[in-house]
Swiss-Prot record:
UniProt family annotation: Belongs to the complex I 30 kDa subunit family.
Disulfide bond positions: none
Protein name listed in UniProt: NADH dehydrogenase [ubiquinone] iron-sulfur protein 3, mitochondrial
Topological category with respect to the lipid bilayer: Peripheral membrane protein
Disruption outcome: Conditional knockout (KO) in the forebrain neurons results in reduced complex I activity, altered brain energy metabolism, increased locomotor activity with impaired motor coordination, balance and stereotyped behavior, neuroinflammation in cortex and hippocampus, and neuronal death in hippocampus. Conditional KO in skeletal muscle results in development of a progressive myopathy resulting in premature death, muscle degeneration accompanied by increased mitochondrial proliferation and serum lactic acidosis and a decrease in complex I activity, assembly and expression in muscle.
Organism this protein belongs to: Mus musculus (Mouse)
Biological processes, Gene Ontology terms: aerobic respiration; mitochondrial electron transport, NADH to ubiquinone; mitochondrial respiratory chain complex I assembly; proton motive force-driven mitochondrial ATP synthesis; reactive oxygen species metabolic process
GO-annotated cellular components: mitochondrial inner membrane; mitochondrial membrane; mitochondrion; myelin sheath; nuclear body; respiratory chain complex I
Transit peptide: 1-35
Amino acid sequence: MAAAAARVWCRGLLGAASVGRGAGRPSVLWQHVRRESAAADKRPTVRPRSDVTHKQLSAFGEYVAEILPKYVQQVQVSCLDELEICIHPDGVIPTLTFLRDHTNAQFKSLADLTAVDVPTRQNRFEIVYNLLSLRFNSRIRVKTYADELTPIDSIVSVHIAANWYEREVWDMFGVFFFNHPDLRRILTDYGFEGHPFRKDFPLTGYVELRYDDEVKRVVAEPVELAQEFRKFDLNSPWEAFPAYRQPPESLKLEAGDKKPETK
């Protein structure tokens, strides 16, 4: 009986030792799982296209076009399942009001309002409204257009969040919003000339600000691009780094050495 108990006890010790030795080395299955996880991490985090979502967005865009045929000019769904509705400038308030109040839409949150400047177009400015529906967890993009002189109706009465957005578009692009309660610059300083986000705005601007120690205040002056005289050696384009050039043969000769004669 004692011998049998001793054999069982020895087997237990050997099994525990084998488990201890194996604990330090990952099993084949664990190595396979780690390789799969490493391969999955390298995949691009791009949302896959859903045919069901694409069809639903297309159907909703066609529905909006049927309800507002006077204003909706184009409906399109991008490859990433993003619905875009292009409307006439006169239909900004009716379209956004419909999208906010309709039961099947409820786009009550204005996520962003911006503009794009395309100087080659007749109506160079593209106004973009990004709307969010918390009820249906959906987004929609409404686009319209304008030029330098034609104003766009303000949507502050529809979305109060558009107040500062429209001020920013006016400041950066110069698009005027009609019936805005307080349309003034929001990012640039008082008396700023021009609109920085226009494609024809110079990179240096028109004026520069500096502190004048004589008058003890900040003064605005026309931009002066003063540059010191620089001499360029254009003999060889490969000698841009003189410190790394090969030293001439005369510098290699020590004092008293004679230059070897060439045959």
